[in-house]
């Protein structure tokens, strides 16, 4: 889902609309709303649901979704699109919950791991076996199995099925296939927005990994935009004037971890200041 998000933003000159502008954040918010609408409608366990992955990432489809975005005026009502290969299906009703960790590791040989792991709620199910807490990840299924017409929801509970996840561990390679950066975050369904924020911050806005991780979190899923405390008040007021429904002053639960390699081979690590993470080397 994070890649659909970025694919829409690729249609705009994000480098000219930085984090100090209302236009930059308006573009970010609208791409978020559109990507979440598609994700909530189409995504489920691919062993049970035909997820149109290629269609969701199709360049023409992303361009058509991006055409819905006007940074001067919020989209009145966001709905899912119809990507190539998509089947008609009911609207989903899943409430995702946070309780996750993320780390990025790079060794002396240049091998990189970006890993997100979860037990769902704090301490998972509350039951420990062999020194490990068992997760309660099944709560990531939709609590409603069918819509009013009796159609099975994409994320409904079924035997042997995996619940939908927002985990987005990311590794970015340059045009030559060489490592450039790795990032990711915990945070329930907000993971998608957190990961996208770190990528846009570094790749489009030219921020350091530390500054990209520390950027105020902005999560837009549906009609309400949740903006973290510390966000520029003038930009927030301008976004409201453009029709966005803003819930300001809300603390967010990101835990972004980043490793980036510069052109001279220097490695830079960064950890989200909101959690107990650090950048370290042997």
Model-derived regions, located:
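A short acidic/small-residue loop/turn micro-motif
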Residues: 120-122, 187-188, 223
